Amino acid sequence: DGYSGVLGRALINQEWRQDFDGFCRILRLPLPNVSAAAITYDDADGVEQTVDSGSFRILSDHMSAYVAASLDTVWPSARMDAGSVRVTFTAGFGDEPADVPASLRSGILLMVGDLYENRATVSERGSGRIDMSTTVNALIAPYRRMTV
């Protein structure tokens, strides 16, 4: 699904990378359910450095996951340049399909079954948007991320 999908999240664990133009108080990630992260940055001389994993925390709020410096820790000095700080992270419910919540799996199966049963109608529409049933919407609604 990814950040631009219907749900706005990764279902099965996937590795993503988000680039930043330097360190700031928090480094907001585009996906929720982040389980691991690594941070690299370019120092003032342009040399790539790695932030010690004990120097930051992975947190989340109502918007998404984010990375913040650990308590009593200050971010290192990074070159203020496009993409000078890089966060590589794992997002998703887990490694296995069974890790995806049951109601979400059920909604996906219902949607795929409905599309298969009505494939002639779907193919006539072309590549336009396909409406989901009320049942599918109800099953996936708790996992849908609304963004502005």
Predicted regions located by residue number:
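Divalent metal-cofactor coordination and adjacent catalytic microenvironments
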Residues: 1-148
